[in-house]
């Protein structure tokens, strides 16, 4: 009898394929006889990369929806995602049983001439489509010009070398996985540019009733990463239910406690509200929810901005 092949749904981008291969290799380490097959899929997010307008951002979940359909329709057994792309609510048929060990969560400053954000001359152009990054950069350097930057990582670097930007901001994890760290000028500390929820984390999704696959994936489960994401995700789940503003949340485990930092701000960087807290590991989700509530209260106190207008 022929062994079952584990079918892995993935986006077609080089980074997504790289992440899927990482999962394949990890599975083969724990299950040497396993057979795998990649199922590359073009997602709504991929087709929108070159057509979306500046005012109409790519919606959360656009990079995973078609992969989830493949799972629900039994065209794939697992799907590999960047955790930061995963929606707050999953389809009722699906579950994320495994978060792999977190890679470097930081953002990278990439430039040909300049070593860091602070060295850029007034009027320099930075490329990033992330509201989170734009907000925090504008708060530090309101004299810089920020333009949207889309495409896969190699395309973005090519645009930098073509002179369309003086610098671009990319995730360290993606550059590392693609062996492109030679382009990094500065690894930006989270205190300067707080990462997105789930940045640097690979998530594996499957059908909720597929007990055999869930068991097969279990060696890849990383407890510390999962606790951090539970805390970070509580922040974004709460705040995204109220508005679509720049949000960041990043948790670390230190001395057997969870340390969570979070922020919310206006896209122009004129207002950023920050908070942080420490809790025992069993209170990770509660910590995230409490900080999110505090952020929203402080944001309303410090601005007359109608958060409901950005739903």
UniProtKB/Swiss-Prot annotation:
One of its GO terms (cellular component) is cytoplasm. Its cofactor is dipyrromethane. Its EC number is 2.5.1.61. InterPro entries: HemC, Porphobilin_deaminase_N, Porphobilinogen_deaminase_C, Porphobilinogen_deaminase_C_sf. GO terms for molecular function: hydroxymethylbilane synthase activity. The modification S-(dipyrrolylmethanemethyl)cysteine is found at residue 243. It catalyses: 4 porphobilinogen + H2O = hydroxymethylbilane + 4 NH4(+). Pathway: Porphyrin-containing compound metabolism; protoporphyrin-IX biosynthesis; coproporphyrinogen-III from 5-aminolevulinate: step 2/4. It comes from the Bacteria. Keywords: Porphyrin biosynthesis, Transferase. Binds 1 dipyrromethane group covalently. GO terms for biological process: protoporphyrinogen IX biosynthetic process. Tetrapolymerization of the monopyrrole PBG into the hydroxymethylbilane pre-uroporphyrinogen in several discrete steps. Belongs to the HMBS family. Monomer. The porphobilinogen subunits are added to the dipyrromethane group. This is Porphobilinogen deaminase. The gene is hemC.
């Amino acid at each position: 009898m022929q062994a079952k092949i584990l079918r892995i749904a993935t986006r077609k981008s080089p980074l997504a394929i790289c992440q899927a291969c990482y999962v394949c290799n990890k599975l083969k380490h724990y299950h040497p006889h396993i057979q795998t097959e990649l199922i590359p899929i073009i997602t709504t997010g991929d087709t929108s990369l070159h057509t979306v307008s500046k005012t109409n951002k790519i919606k959360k979940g656009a990079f995973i929806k078609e992969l989830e359909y493949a799972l629900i329709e039994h065209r794939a057994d697992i799907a590999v995602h960047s955790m930061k792309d995963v929606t707050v609510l999953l389809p009722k048929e699906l579950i994320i049983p495994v978060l792999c060990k977190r890679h470097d969560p930081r953002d990278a400053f990439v430039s040909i001439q300049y070593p860091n954000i602070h060295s850029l001359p007034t009027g320099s152009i930075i490329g990033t489509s992330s509201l989170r990054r734009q907000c925090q950069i504008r708060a530090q350097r309101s004299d810089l010009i920020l333009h949207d930057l889309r495409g896969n990582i190699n395309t973005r670097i090519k645009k930098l070398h073509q002179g369309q930007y003086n610098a671009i901001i990319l995730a360290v994890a993606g550059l590392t996985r693609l062996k492109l760290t030679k382009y990094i000028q500065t690894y930006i500390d989270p205190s300067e540019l707080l990462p997105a929820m789930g940045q640097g984390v690979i998530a594996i999704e499957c059908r909720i009733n597929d007990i055999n696959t869930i068991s097969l994936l279990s060696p890849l489960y990383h407890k510390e990463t999962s606790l951090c994401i539970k805390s970070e995700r509580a922040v974004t789940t709460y705040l995204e239910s109220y508005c679509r503003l720049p949000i960041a949340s990043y948790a670390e485990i230190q001395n057997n406690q969870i340390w969570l930092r979070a922020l919310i701000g206006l896209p122009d960087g004129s207002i950023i509200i920050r908070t942080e807290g420490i809790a025992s590991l069993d209170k990770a989700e509660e910590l995230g929810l409490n900080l999110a509530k505090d952020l929203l209260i402080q944001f309303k106190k410090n601005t007359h901005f109608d958060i409901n207008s950005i739903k």
